[in-house]
Amino acid sequence: MALSTDKSSKPYVRYLPFVPNGEVNIPPSKSDVHRAIICAALTRGKCTIAPVALSNDIKATIGVIEDMGCTASIKDGVLTVDGTNIFKTDNVTLDCGESGSALRFFIPVAAAGGINATFVGHGKLPERPIGIFTEALPKAGVKCETEGGLPLKISGRLESGTFEIPGNVSSQFITGLLLALPLVEGDSDIVLTSPIESVGYINMTIHTMAQFGVEIETTDNGWHIKGGQSYIPHDYTTDGDWSQAAFFMVAGALGGKVTVNGVNRNSAQGDRKIAELLAQFGAKVTQTDTSVTVEKAELNAIDIDASQIPDLVPVLTVCAAFAKGTTGIYNAERLRIKECDRLTATAKLINDLGGKVTELPDGLVIEGIDTLKADSVRALMTTEL
């Protein structure tokens, strides 16, 4: 593999044929770090979070808490957050970069703090849907001003109440409300109006909040949130990132033998299901409490319900391209409204390499083949949880 910086084109990566073998130490989960940073800021005290890797999305989250009055510093992978002065600023611009997570987490959090804020973003973020909030928050004391998307101006203070939310929208909306509603006076309920998808990310939120002393009660059709709770300062240890581990695990299934280290078998991350799915494909999977080893074996097609694991769809499609038979991936329509249409982008990438992928409205159908061809492809996707 080589990285080119030819001035006549954008940087690109050149891959040469090889059989992947070896061990990989997985970096911390970006999804986990996002949530921990916000919880730490809301303690109004001093916390550490470790290990932390500074991706652009995490930098955006740190920037937002700083603009809301917190201080943050990082050294040797340990992030220190001091939330003493959170919400003591007003009329602030909160730049969420290209992070949908930061945007949808912080809108209700800022509203719970009663600050006047203008949310801005870059790339495709200004076009990402926020209608769930612009419809629900004005009913709960928050004025929202937007011409559709960003910039979004909010003012007023979030009030308790009942929030009816479709279950098939991004779980980021629900996470934002879960983080914010314990801060307001009075109890609240989030009521699902349709079956929940990506529940793993919501469970991760609830798990992280519990580490900081905040309780969420799961009900038959949503969640009950007690008001007037306080986030308690806590030194937080992050999980390894199952989403990133998935790519190396699939490489093992297709190539030789790959071990990923630093992944928690009992993690709240829904993407830990990758180990189970690769075993269903036929790969040899061996798991301990903190590692997974995947070895090549004959792969056979399976059907995959992606409603709870949409971010695994691209890498699962790669695996399916080499599995005998026809694999179907369903219930992933939300991938069409990410930073790009991930279903179309994934299908195009595999087909450009000689694969056979057909798009469905909510997924992909992949016919397995023996090998893909060498070619140039354009990367359109970023991961964002």
Feature locations, PLM:
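Structural preference for solvent-exposed beta-strand-turn elements
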Residues: 2-385
